[in-house]
Amino acid sequence: MLGTSNLKVTALALVLYIPALALASDLPDSTLTPGAINPYVTQQNIHKTVCVKGYTKTIRPPAHFTNKLKKQQMREYGYADRNPKHYEEDHLIALSIGGAPDDPNNLWPEPRISEWNAKKKDRLEFVLYKMVCRQEISLTEAQHAMATNWIEAWKQYVPSHQHYR
């Protein structure tokens, strides 16, 4: 009996000391990545900022910044899969709808291998960008939809806007 008791205590100690690892989620952890907006982009200036062709290229942070941040955030998220190639360091609120370019609160390691992956989110980003620039939706409404739950936003907006290519 004493041996069984020691084994249980040892097993419990191992469980307590193993760092928590998580599977990547399709949605970011809202406490780690709540989203952040670019204060220089407003509804009044969208046709001079986000709606100008090539705008996002002028504000996108350099790869050395996002690659370093991706590795740091993968640890913070506790992802079990630590291969950086399996993630895209993505803006929760897209640059094309006024997301903050280099605020870590707006960046997260988004899974590439999943049903709701980075490619699907890119489609939503384009649809919301077109809707904002065509004034079908307000800038703040698009930002809120993306930050709150981008999967639900995809379901709401993408199927009804298939003509946006």
Sequence positions of predicted segments:
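Nuclease and nuclease-like effector domains acting on nucleic acids or nucleotide cofactors
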Residues: 2-9, 15-87, 96-165
